[in-house]
């Protein structure tokens, strides 16, 4: 669920973060740009893991967001993925959840195997046609 601008909707944000545990949330993924306070504020309120996604910004390309999320004070950790790294944030959350869900762990293992097979297939094609003809 999107919260929009946390600065303009503080009451909704605080209620959401405070009630996440009782709603059964095991991890929160929070994307934010610029000053990127949303992931850190979630981590300060929510006792489970928080994954921060720094969003690309026009002024600094997302580095401002990245630094804001990565530089959390001691005791308030936020796992941080790459700028616009939503896919990896989802995978990281799935891996956290898989520590207590065998079926999810099996699906993650199958996904990892499919990635490995995809790379092996691409490598075989590269070896066959050479780098000059690879994308033709």
What are these regions (language model features)?
Residues 38, 42-82:
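Long, charge-patterned amphipathic alpha-helical coiled-coil/hairpin "stalk" segments used as oligomerization
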Residues 10-11, 32-41, 60-63, 86-90:
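Short glycine/serine/threonine-rich phosphate/pyrophosphate-binding segments
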Residues 2-7:
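Short, small-residue-biased leader/transition segments that mark boundaries at the very start
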Residues 8-18:
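Structural motif
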Residues 63-136:
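C-terminal binding/interaction regions
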Residues 16-54:
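Glycine-rich phosphate-binding loop
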């Amino acid at each position: 669920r999107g919260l929009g601008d946390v600065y303009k909707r503080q009451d909704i944000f605080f209620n959401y973060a405070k009630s996440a545990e009782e709603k059964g949330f095991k991890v929160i993924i929070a994307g934010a740009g610029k000053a990127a306070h949303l992931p850190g504020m979630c981590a300060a309120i929510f006792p489970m893991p928080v994954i921060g996604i720094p969003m690309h910004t026009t002024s600094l390309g997302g580095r401002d967001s990245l630094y804001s999320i990565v530089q959390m004070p001691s005791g308030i950790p936020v796992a941080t993925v790459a700028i616009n790294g939503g896919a990896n944030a989802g995978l990281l959350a799935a891996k956290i959840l898989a520590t207590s869900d065998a079926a999810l762990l099996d699906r993650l293992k199958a996904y990892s195997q499919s990635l490995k097979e995809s790379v092996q297939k691409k490598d075989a094609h590269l070896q066959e046609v050479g780098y000059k003809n690879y994308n033709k």
